[in-house]
Amino acid sequence: GLTDDEIIRGIAAYQPVGSRARVVRTARYTVIDDCYNANPDSTAAALRSMATLPAGRRVAVLGNMGELGANAAALHRETGVCAAKAGVSLVITCGELARQIAAGAAAENPAVATASFDTLDALLPALPGLLQPGDCVLVKASHSMQFERIVQALTQA
């Protein structure tokens, strides 16, 4: 077996696999790369986790969540409410359903700023103008949204 010290060192050295709750600190931002997949529960958990990180402004870049059936719009809206309750200052969305996330956040707390984009190609060039140095940025959506492109842009900025 392992000693207690070996177990502690192993836990301390843990790095998530792929784009699953991976925290990347750059000169400009703290990026939470959780873009491998998304559903309402995992997104709510990611938003709550972001609230525990020491950082400046909290920004959530959120996209469509797939396979939610007839309740998809309502579940996206509830995710926006969760973002507002988690202390997110800015909600940036991409995709038609994700607009409901922005609507839910603004309805819960009108002080939450929102920006919504139809496509990733529209969002990417606008992103630098929306973010500020020191921001903590959560990036989360269903894998089909290709949000790894956002993570790449943020971590190479």
Predicted regions and their residues:
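ATP-dependent carboxylate-amine ligase
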Residues: 1-157
